[in-house]
């Protein structure tokens, strides 16, 4: 956080990450049942209150998502978790998105890749325009 993200942001760079605090809340809090208040407090300490301007959630029915993962071959520990775990994680992500609709973009991951790319770029372009305008 302090070595990479903050300096880049202070320098005016746009930072894109694969996962951030929302993933911890979804996976650890909702998926594994850890105390959400504790995760929120820990996240606030670790990030120093830093929050993304945009979180893109590629939403898919967990059963379908697991089918896609299995078709790729090798899986990791989280991907091998049972369907109920993935359903809880999905609910955790969707709950966060519903509480912060201005900073989340929820997309149907079953849509064609080109369509998803367009939707993401439209939202990112809008944010970049606000930043420079």
Give residue ranges: language-model regions.
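NTP-dependent small-molecule kinase module
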Residues: 63-133
């Amino acid at each position: 956080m302090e070595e990479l993200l903050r300096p880049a942001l202070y320098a005016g760079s746009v930072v894109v990450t694969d996962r951030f605090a929302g993933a911890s809340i979804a996976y650890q809090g909702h998926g594994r049942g850890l105390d959400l208040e504790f995760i929120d407090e820990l996240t606030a300490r670790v990030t120093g209150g830093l929050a993304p301007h945009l979180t893109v959630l590629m939403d898919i029915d967990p059963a379908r998502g697991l089918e896609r993962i299995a078709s790729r071959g090798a899986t990791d520990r989280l991907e091998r978790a049972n369907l109920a775990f993935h359903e809880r994680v999905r609910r955790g992500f969707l709950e966060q998105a519903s509480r912060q609709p201005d900073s989340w973009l929820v997309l149907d991951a079953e849509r064609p890749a080109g369509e998803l790319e367009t939707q993401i770029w439209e939202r990112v372009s809008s944010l970049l325009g606000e930043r420079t305008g």
